[in-house]
């Protein structure tokens, strides 16, 4: 049952509890398991991958069958409908168009005495994309991770994903990968896949950046290999916070709440509204839509533990509460959403108006759906082209510029006791 909370102190406490739902305290057992997997893959390479795949996925592989071959890639196109292929291609087009606008440009500026300063952006050489298996196939995850890497100019893009029954990979995932330009695909998942990407094996060369969502073990593995490789984020369960006025449609709000809850038993679905009548209507609509929901058990668990409706005095108070929660997805289902946007400080993505369900951002609109969760929107942003880029500073001094500023450099170097730093300038200033 979706709860309605009317007391502000209780509402704040519940929002904090939900935000902290993935703070599992001691995870020593899981961390130890992941550490052992990482060490084993780093040491034994393909043999470890094959043994872990047999242990966890109950699939028997060989070094020759780790990589998805061309005939399986070709066959995938015969197994998807024209409607799905068209949808994948439209999504690719719009995601690519959006991310091309976000590519930063290298620059230089010319200062006094011939000083040249600048910044040069370059892509990483290789990126590894993790695509979950398990409850569902996620071609959208492929597109959202691969396309920014392509736009950034990454030369080698690798995808890893757990194998299904018969060693197969979902054809929709394979088609999305090919549409996004990926041909190097491996049927391996879990922490062992992250280890392979980070350390390399006989079959899977290492990469520079790893992106993509996964379960707790994948997240812990990404956390532990960070530093050896870059990562996008430590993503937790999905979440939506909806701010709605009395004119919002209850059934539509209910569908948006359930759209998050159906992801995961830990998913959060929150509505903040000043309208008690809307709140009650949403509860009714949620119950009606759950009645024949194909993922009813999973979705009900999320709604029961991490779903709520909070009654607020004003929409402005709702925004203040949202900022403290820093949701992954924020929907402003109000008559004038632009009047609230400037007050929003912390949100992964903001969806404006009654006709903008979060699902359009998940699949098609263009902005990335890989977003910060569990309050991380306070300091983090969506995955994007920048995830696959790095920048180098450019500095050039002329003799005149060094004569003018060298004294200050030497003073600072002497203050820090770094005599060779001082002398590297002094020797250049000698006649």
From Swiss-Prot:
Entry note: cofactor: Binds 1 zinc ion per subunit.
Cofactors required: Zn(2+)
Binding site for NAD(+): 130, 192, 215
Uppermost EC category: oxidoreductase
Catalytic residue list: 328-329
Alphabetical GO biological process terms: L-histidine biosynthetic process
A molecular-function term among this protein's GO annotations: NAD binding
EC number: 1.1.1.23
Binding site for substrate: 238, 260, 263, 329, 362, 416, 421
Gene3D superfamilies, per the entry: 1.20.5.1300, Nitrogenase molybdenum iron protein domain
Recorded catalytic activity of this chain's protein: L-histidinol + 2 NAD(+) + H2O = L-histidine + 2 NADH + 3 H(+)
Alphabetized PROSITE patterns for the sequence: HISOL_DEHYDROGENASE
UniProt KW keywords: Amino-acid biosynthesis, Histidine biosynthesis, Metal-binding, NAD, Oxidoreductase, Zinc
Xref: InterPro entries: Ald_DH/histidinol_DH (IPR016161), Histidinol_DH_CS (IPR001692), Histidinol_DH_monofunct (IPR022695), Hstdl_DH (IPR012131)
GO cellular component: cytosol
Residues given in the record as Zn(2+) binding sites: 260, 263, 362, 421
Pathway noted in the entry: Amino-acid biosynthesis; L-histidine biosynthesis; L-histidine from 5-phospho-alpha-D-ribose 1-diphosphate: step 9/9
Function summary: Catalyzes the sequential NAD-dependent oxidations of L-histidinol to L-histidinaldehyde and then to L-histidine.
The family this protein is said to belong to: Belongs to the histidinol dehydrogenase family.
NCBIfam families, A to Z: hisD
The protein, known as: Histidinol dehydrogenase
Origin species: Thermosynechococcus vestitus (strain NIES-2133 / IAM M-273 / BP-1)
């Amino acid at each position: 049952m979706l709860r309605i909370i009317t007391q502000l102190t209780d509402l704040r406490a519940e929002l904090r509890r939900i935000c902290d739902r993935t703070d599992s305290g001691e995870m020593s057992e899981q961390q130890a398991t992941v550490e052992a997997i990482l060490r084993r893959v780093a040491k034994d390479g393909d043999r470890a991958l094959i043994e872990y795949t047999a242990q966890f996925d109950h699939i028997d592989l060989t070094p020759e069958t780790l990589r998805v071959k061309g005939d399986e890639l070709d066959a995938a196109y015969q197994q998807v409908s024209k409607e799905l292929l068209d949808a994948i291609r439209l999504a690719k087009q719009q995601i690519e168009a959006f991310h091309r606008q976000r590519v930063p440009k290298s620059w230089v500026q010319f200062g006094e005495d011939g000083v040249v300063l600048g910044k040069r952006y370059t892509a990483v050489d290789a990126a590894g994309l993790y695509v979950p298996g398990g409850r569902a196939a996620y071609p959208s995850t492929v597109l959202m991770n691969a396309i920014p890497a392509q736009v950034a100019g990454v030369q080698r893009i690798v995808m890893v994903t757990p194998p299904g029954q018969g060693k197969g990979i979902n054809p929709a995932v394979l088609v999305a990968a090919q549409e996004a330009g990926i041909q190097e695909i491996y049927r391996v998942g879990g922490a062992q896949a992250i280890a392979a990407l980070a350390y390399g094996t006989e079959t899977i060369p290492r990469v520079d950046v790893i992106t993509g969502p996964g379960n707790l073990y994948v997240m812990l593995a990404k956390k532990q290999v960070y530093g050896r490789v870059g990562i996008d984020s430590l993503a937790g369960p999905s979440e939506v916070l909806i701010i709605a006025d009395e004119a919002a449609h209850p059934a539509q709000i209910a569908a948006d709440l359930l759209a998050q809850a159906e992801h995961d038993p830990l998913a959060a679905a929150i509505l903040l509204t000043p309208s008690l009548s809307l709140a009650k209507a949403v509860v009714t609509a949620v119950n009606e839509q759950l009645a024949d929901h194909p993922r009813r058990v999973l979705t009900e668990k999320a709604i029961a533990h991490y779903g709520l409706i909070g009654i607020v005095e004003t929409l402005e108070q709702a925004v203040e509460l949202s900022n403290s929660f820093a949701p992954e997805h924020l929907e402003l289902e109000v008559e004038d959403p632009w009047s609230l946007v400037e007050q929003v400080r912390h949100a992964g993505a903001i969806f404006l108006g009654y006709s903008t369900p979060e699902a359009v951002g998940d699949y098609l609109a263009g902005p990335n759906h890989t977003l910060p969760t569990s309050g991380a929107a306070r300091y983090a942003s969506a995955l994007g082209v920048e995830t696959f880029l790095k920048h180098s500073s450019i500095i050039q001094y002329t003799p005149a510029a060094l004569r003018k500023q060298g004294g200050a450099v030497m003073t600072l170097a002497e203050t820090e006791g770094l005599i060779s730093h001082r002398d590297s300038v002094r020797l250049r200033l000698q006649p």
